[in-house]
From Swiss-Prot:
GO MF entries: basic amino acid transmembrane transporter activity
Keyword Nucleotide-binding: no
Residues with attached carbohydrate: 123, 324, 504
Matches recorded under SUPFAM superfamilies: MFS general substrate transporter
Vacuolar topological domain: 1-30, 122-131, 188-190, 254-255, 314-331, 387-419, 470-528
Protein name (Swiss-Prot/TrEMBL): Vacuolar basic amino acid transporter 1
Superkingdom per UniProt: Eukaryota
Organism: Saccharomyces cerevisiae (strain ATCC 204508 / S288c) (Baker's yeast)
Role this protein plays: Transporter required for vacuolar uptake of at least histidine and lysine.
Membrane-protein topology: Multi-pass membrane protein
Similarity section: Belongs to the major facilitator superfamily.
Length: 562
C-alpha cells in the first residue's frame, strides 16, 4: 500500500487523466470512422501539392529562360513557399475553430485558383504571384491532412499512417519531376497547371462527402463563422511573419537599400514577437506551450528542411546547366530522392509502432540519425561535384576508376548522396510529428502540428531561396571578376552584353556564343558558384547534429529519472 504525505500528488498524470465524457465520446466516434474514404479525400490533395512542388523545381529554369528573366528564378520557388509558410499555421487554428472540413475546403479553393492563374502568367512576376496564391492553399492541404490523421488514429498508429501519407507525398514528388519535363517539352507548362484545377475540384467534392470528424473544442455550427470566433485567427501574427521572412529574402537577393531593408526586417520581427506575446488571443506561435524539447526539435526541423529544399532546387539547375542534361532526364534523377522519402517514412513509422523503448526517446534518436544522414549526403555531394568537371572531362577518383561526364559511376554516387539527404529528412519528419502527438494535449494538437509545419515551411522557403541566392550572387560576382577584372592569358574580350545575357538567360551559356576554350573556363566559374552554395547547408547540418544529440541526451535523462 502506497504511503501518502502532504507532498503526494493526488491527481493522475495528464496522460492518465480521463477526458470529459463528450470529448471521449467524440474521440471514440472518430476512431471508429472508416479510414479509407477520409484518407483518400485528404491524400489526393496532398498528392497534388507534392506534385506541384517538384514540377516547379524541375521546370523553373526553363520557365525563367522563356521569360528571359533567369536572374529572378528564385522567386518562382520562393513565392509559393513563402505563402505556404505564412498560412500553414493559420490552417491549424482555423481547423480548430471551424472544423477540419471547412479549413480543408478553404485550402482547396486557393490552391485551385492559384493553378488557374498560373496558366495565364506573362512574366516571372505574374507567375510568382499566381504561385503565391497557390501556396496559400498548398499549406493547408498538407497541414490539415496531418492534423486529421491524428483525429482518427491513436498515437502509435499515427506513425504508420504518417508513413503512408509520406508515401503518397513522395509518389507525388516522384511523378512531378518527370511529368514536368515531359509536359514542358511537349504541350507546355501551362497545360500542366491547368489540368490540376478539375482534380482539386474533385477533392472538394470528396471532402464535403467524407470529412465528418467531430471535435469537442469546435463551436456549434451557428457560432463557427461569427466575427468573434474568426477573430481568434492570428492574422496579424501571420502577416508580420511574412514581412520578416520577405525582408530576409530581399536582403539577400535585392539591390534595394540594405539599411532600409534591415530596419524593415527587424521591425517586422519585433512586431511579430509583440503580437504573439501580448496581442493575439490564440497565437500561431504559442510561447507558453514551447517546451525545451519542442524548441530543439523545431530548430532541427528548420535545419533539415533548409538542407533538403536547398538540394531539391539546386540539383536540377546543376544537372541542366553544367552536365547539359535535359529537363526530362533531370526528372529521372529526382525520382530516387522522392522514393527515399516514401521508404524512409514507412520505415520510421514501423519502427515507432513496434519499439519497446520510450516512444519520445526513440523518436529523438531517429531525428539524430536523420541529421547524420543528411550531413553525409551533403558532404558526399560536395566532394563529387568538386572533382567532377562539367560535361566532358575525366576525373580519376581512384587509379583504377575513371569518371567521364557520360559515365554511370558519378551519376550513381550523385543519386546516392541525394537519397541520403531525403531519407534522413523523411525519418526526421515522421519522428517529430509522432513526438508531438505523444507530448501535446489533444485540444492543442492541431495548433502545435500547425506550429511544426510552420518551422518546416520556414526551413523550406529559406533553404530554397537562400541556396539559389547564394549560387546566383556567387555566380554574378565571379563571372564579373573573370570577364572584366582578372588578368587572363587569352586575347578574348568580353562585352557587358554577354555578361548580362549569361545572368538573365542561362540558355545563352550553351549557345554558340563563345570559343571552346573560353566556354570551358566559364563552365568552371559556374561550377565554383555551385560549390559555394553547398557551404551554408553543410554548416547548418553540422549544427543540426549537435542540437539533435543534445535532444537525445536530454530526453534520456528525463526518461531515466522518471
Amino acid at each position: 500500500m502506497q504511503t501518502l504525505d502532504e507532498t503526494s500528488n493526488l491527481l493522475p498524470p495528464p496522460e492518465e487523466a480521463e477526458a470529459p465524457p463528450l470529448e471521449q465520446k467524440f474521440h471514440e466516434y472518430n476512431l471508429a470512422l472508416p479510414k479509407f474514404p477520409i484518407l483518400f479525400s485528404l491524400w489526393l490533395g496532398s498528392f497534388l501539392s507534392s506534385l506541384d512542388s517538384t514540377i516547379v523545381a524541375n521546370i523553373m529554369n526553363r520557365v525563367a529562360e522563356e521569360f528571359s528573366e533567369s536572374s529572378k528564378k528564385q522567386w518562382i520557388a520562393t513565392s509559393f513557399l513563402l505563402t505556404n509558410t505564412a498560412f500553414q499555421p493559420l490552417y491549424g487554428k482555423l481547423s480548430d475553430i471551424t472544423g477540419r472540413k471547412s479549413a480543408l475546403l478553404t485550402a482547396q479553393f486557393f490552391f485551385g485558383l492559384g493553378c488557374l492563374l498560373t496558366c495565364f502568367a506573362r512574366n516571372v512576376t505574374e507567375f510568382s504571384i499566381a504561385r503565391a496564391i497557390c501556396g496559400i492553399g498548398a499549406g493547408g492541404l498538407n497541414a490539415i491532412s496531418s492534423i486529421a490523421v491524428s483525429d482518427i488514429c491513436t498515437a502509435r498508429e499515427r506513425g504508420v499512417y504518417q508513413g503512408y501519407a509520406n508515401i503518397v507525398f513522395g509518389f507525388g514528388q516522384l511523378l512531378g519531376a518527370p511529368l514536368g519535363g515531359v509536359f514542358i517539352e511537349t504541350i507546355g507548362w501551362r497545360a500542366l497547371f491547368g489540368i490540376q484545377v478539375p482534380v482539386i475540384m474533385l477533392c472538394s467534392v470528396l471532402a464535403i462527402k467524407n470529412i465528418n470528424i467531430k471535435l469537442f473544442h469546435v463551436p456549434p455550427m451557428k457560432e463557427r463563422y461569427t466575427l468573434k470566433n474568426l477573430s481568434r485567427i492570428d492574422i496579424f501574427g501571420s502577416l508580420s511573419l511574412v514581412a520578416t521572412i520577405s525582408g530576409v529574402l530581399f536582403l539577400c537577393s535585392s539591390q534595394l537599400n540594405k539599411l532600409y531593408l534591415a530596419l524593415f526586417t527587424i521591425g517586422s520581427f519585433i512586431v511579430f514577437i509583440l503580437v504573439e506575446r501580448y496581442y493575439a488571443t490564440e497565437k500561431i506561435l504559442p510561447f507558453e506551450l514551447l517546451t525545451r524539447s519542442f524548441c530543439l526539435s523545431s530548430a532541427v526541423t528548420v535545419i533539415s528542411s533548409f538542407v533538403v529544399f536547398g538540394e531539391i532546387f539546386r540539383s536540377p539547375i546543376y544537372l541542366q546547366l553544367l552536365q547539359n542534361i535535359s529537363v526530362t532526364k533531370t526528372g529521372l534523377f529526382l525520382i530516387f530522392p522522392s522514393i527515399s522519402v516514401a521508404v524512409g517514412s514507412l520505415v520510421t513509422g514501423w519502427v515507432l509502432r513496434n519499439t519497446k523503448i520510450n516512444l519520445a526517446h526513440c523518436a529523438y534518436q531517429i531525428i539524430f540519425g536523420g541529421m547524420i544522414m543528411q550531413l553525409l549526403g551533403l558532404g558526399l555531394g560536395y566532394f563529387l561535384l568538386s572533382h567532377l568537371n562539367p560535361d566532358y572531362t575525366i576525373y580519376d577518383m581512384l587509379e583504377s576508376i575513371t569518371f567521364r561526364s557520360n559515365s554511370i559511376w558519378w551519376k550513381l554516387i550523385y543519386v546516392f548522396a541525394s537519397v541520403l539527404v531525403s531519407f534522413g529528412y523523411a525519418c526526421l519528419l515522421v519522428a517529430t510529428l509522432v513526438s508531438i502527438v505523444f507530448t501535446v494535449e489533444k485540444s492543442q494538437q492541431g495548433t502545435m502540428t500547425g506550429v511544426f509545419y510552420l518551422w518546416r515551411s520556414i526551413g523550406n522557403v529559406l533553404g530554397a531561396s537562400l541556396t539559389l541566392v547564394s549560387y546566383e550572387n556567387s555566380l554574378s560576382s565571379m563571372l564579373w571578376n573573370y570577364m572584366f577584372k582578372t588578368k587572363r592569358d587569352d586575347e578574348y574580350h568580353f562585352t557587358k552584353k554577354q555578361y548580362y545575357s549569361l545572368i538573365n538567360d542561362s540558355s545563352y551559356l550553351r549557345g554558340p556564343n563563345f570559343p571552346t576554350d573560353i566556354f570551358v573556363r566559364i563552365l568552371d566559374v559556374y561550377k565554383k558558384a555551385f560549390l559555394i552554395s553547398y557551404i551554408p547547408n553543410i554548416a547548418l547540418a553540422a549544427v543540426g547534429i549537435v542540437l539533435s544529440l543534445y535532444l537525445v541526451k536530454h530526453t534520456y535523462k528525463r526518461s531515466s529519472s522518471s
